[in-house]
Amino acid sequence: MVTIQADEISNIIRERIEQYNREVKIVNTGTVLQVGDGIARIHGLDEVMAGELVEFEEGTIGIALNLESTNVGVVLMGDGLLIQEGSSVKATGRIAQIPVSEAYLGRVINALAKPIDGRGEISSSEYRLIESPAPGIISRRSVYEPLQTGLIAIDSMIPIGRGQRELIIGDRQTGKTAVATDTILNQQGKNVICVYVAIGQKASSVAQVVTNFQERGAMEYTIVVAETADSPATLQYLAPYTGAALAEYFMYRERHTSIIYDDPSKQAQAYRQMSLLLRRPPGREAYPGDVFYLHSRLLERAAKLSSLLGEGSMTALPIVETQSGDVSAYIPTNVISITDGQIFLSADLFNAGIRPAINVGISVSRVGSAAQIKAMKQVAGKLKLELAQFAELEAFAQFASDLDKATQNQLARGQRLRELLKQSQSAPLGVEEQVLTIYTGTNGYLDSLEIGQVRKFLVELRTYLKTNKPQFQEIISSTKTFTEEAEAILKEAIKEQRERFILQEQAA
């Protein structure tokens, strides 16, 4: 048996006393009073911040949203089925933040920036607050570079600039998401990072969008943030802010980004659900009083940064669904007033076979031609006016039986112009192809063709120019101007192609 000397014991005790570190650890805790419907009421948590993350005993994380005199209202970021009355909660001292890095490109994540595509963890060393203040006036500069969507109707008449916020609005099943996804597909090779945020969508439609991106190589420069319809309201509410934080990370690193919110009205519904359960007073359409602020603080984060900050940009394209064309509902009017213009998609046009179903008459871009290259300004000037006059004449022509020759010609031209605006889904056009298409239509080169032949002729003309006269594309892309030389090349190509086309049609 080992005998321990008394002085050894005293040495050990002395050593331990010397090593003892008096560390006071203060933990801000509380107790669950009530839990259910994704909301927990907590007693305690005296020094909790608004929006602070709190952690429940069994691991669920929540956000403290309501700070009342007797309790704290917390929204849960999970189902919270294991939380019991009386269990303890501790404040983390952190506001909601997510990891950010280049490694997120090509991935599908949830509102907490956790991967949901089954391809393993995402490495990152930096963190960014989910909610951060928008750039101030001095930090911005006016929008001057175009963000090409690849859709003729938008790029020619409702141009979108880098750093702009343009609303895409229309009834369900009018092709809103298709316009947004085509815009992402068109950014290939243009050094633009895209973020697609799906809020409250069907999982099948999100999967379809992701597959479309993968097949066309767009996932290389795209991040998809998805919270589907079965996600807790808290996560649907957070998803757009997560997407904005990721886009901001790239924007402040002198990159151009584009973010699509599909759609903020679902976020507003999730926020309404949370607010009503937290017993906040309801306002118009039962939405809480700060639902405007919900969207304004999100969309104001889109900006074109000043040269001091590196001239990065974040272009926001929110998508809002209307009920039977009612643009005057609460959420649509809110978002219209926040954004710099809107693209209105009409169910009537969609059903009439005009796709993309953009109603050019009531769609606007408040940035306007500042976001167009010179070549596009040169050819697109007449297009909107001619289409507006055509729409007016068409309505008038329904009542008039005999029309003079000039009116008949104007109607024929208008029908062909409307035809050239039609495009297939996932087939965006480059700006050079758009310029030649619009020039061909507005200068009457399509007037002699049947309406059914217009699209076929234009497809063949674009192919003919690309293979036989590549210098046209070089002039437009290098000078960004529709020069006399480019016009001469184009006129010659149209003449040659028309002769070939007429011979083909006669042979058929």
From Swiss-Prot:
GO MF annotation terms: ATP binding; proton-transporting ATP synthase activity, rotational mechanism
EC number: 7.1.2.2
Compartmental location: Plastid, Chloroplast thylakoid membrane
GO CC aspect terms: chloroplast thylakoid membrane; proton-transporting ATP synthase complex
Main location as per UniProt: plastid
Keywords: ATP synthesis, ATP-binding, CF(1), Chloroplast, Hydrogen ion transport, Ion transport, Membrane, Nucleotide-binding, Plastid, Thylakoid, Translocase, Transport
Function text: Produces ATP from ADP in the presence of a proton gradient across the membrane. The alpha chain is a regulatory subunit.
HAMAP family: ATP_synth_alpha_bact
Family, as annotated: Belongs to the ATPase alpha/beta chains family.
Listed name of the protein: ATP synthase subunit alpha, chloroplastic
InterPro entries registered for this protein in UniProt: ATP_synth_asu-like_sf, ATP_synth_asu_C, ATP_synth_asu_C_sf, ATP_synth_F1_a_nt-bd_dom, ATP_synth_F1_asu, ATPase_a/bsu_AS, ATPase_F1/V1/A1_a/bsu_N, ATPase_F1/V1/A1_a/bsu_N_sf
Subunit (UniProt): F-type ATPases have 2 components, CF(1) - the catalytic core - and CF(0) - the membrane proton channel. CF(1) has five subunits: alpha(3), beta(3), gamma(1), delta(1), epsilon(1). CF(0) has four main subunits: a, b, b' and c.
Site (Required for activity): 363
Membrane topology annotation: Peripheral membrane protein
Claim: Disulfide bond is one of the keywords in the record: no
Binding site for ATP: 170-177
Matching PANTHER family: ATP SYNTHASE SUBUNIT ALPHA, MITOCHONDRIAL
Domain of life: Eukaryota
Known catalytic reactions: ATP + H2O + 4 H(+)(in) = ADP + phosphate + 5 H(+)(out)
